Structures are given as structure tokens and as C-alpha cells.
Amino acid sequence: MDFETIDPTDFGTSLTGIGINLLVRDVQAETRFLTQVFQMQGHRISADFAIMQNLSQLLQLHSDGTYFSHSLLDLLPENPPRGAGCEIRLYHCDPDQAADKAEHAGGMVLQPPTDKPHGLRECYILCPDGYAWVPSLAIKS
């Protein structure tokens, strides 16, 4: 599927499983953050929308303005964090590399890379919009 040229209706009807759609203040800034810190690929990037790809998984970014008539917009806090209580986990994403890049890209490392009892090395990073991203890799024995 060519994400740069696909018709919006064809894209929407092709989605399956669970989808993640994040409302952000600045789509292009969030795209840069996700690309720089987590090596995601951005597609159809505009001021209002982007398709982000992490391995085979997709998520969508929408600007606040695209939800101008949606009741969800009224629930967003004026200041981050926006995603309190939600972790967006990125498996097979190096937490040490992500943590090294996060602050330079405008994020904040909440928890540095740590080996966890469940077999993953992970860290917690807040993006400028306040969503918690958790890159992780299996601990090498």
C-alpha cells in the first residue's frame, strides 16, 4: 500500500484491529519527534494529518483543529500531558538510543533505560504533547 497516494476512503476502510489516533497541537513537530527519537516513518505529512509507521504498525496524528466540531476536543487539557494513564509501547525499539535522542528532540525521559523483570529493557519518554512512549527491547542474556 502506498501511503503517500492512497485515497482517504481506501485507507480508512483498509484499517483493521486496534487503531491509535493521537490529537496533537502540531502534527509536523510530532512527526519530527517520532522520526528522530523512534525512527518511525511519516507519510502524507501535512499541518493537519500524518500517517506514522512503526515496523508494520500504523498510527495517525491529527491536529486539534481537525476535531473542531468533535466533542473529544473539549476534553483535552490546555497543557500537556494529554495522554495521562496511557502508555504507547514500541517493541523492538532500542530504549537506550531513544533516550539519548529524546531531550534533543524536545521530549523528556521520565524513566531512563532499565532492565525489567518481564524480560524487557525499556524507558519512558514524554513527547512535547505529553504522551508516554515506551521503547523496549528484549534483554540480551
What is each stretch, according to the model?
Residues 18-33:
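Short, basic/low-complexity N-terminal boundary segments at the transition from targeting/disordered tails
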Residues 30-35, 102, 130:
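Conserved active-site tyrosine of GNAT-family acetyltransferases
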Residues 28, 96, 120:
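Loop/helix-junction capping segments adjacent to catalytic residues or to phosphate/diphosphate-binding pockets
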Residues 29, 44, 94:
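Short, conserved clusters of charged catalytic residues that mark active-site
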Residues 1-19, 40-90, 99-126, 137-141:
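Vicinal oxygen chelate
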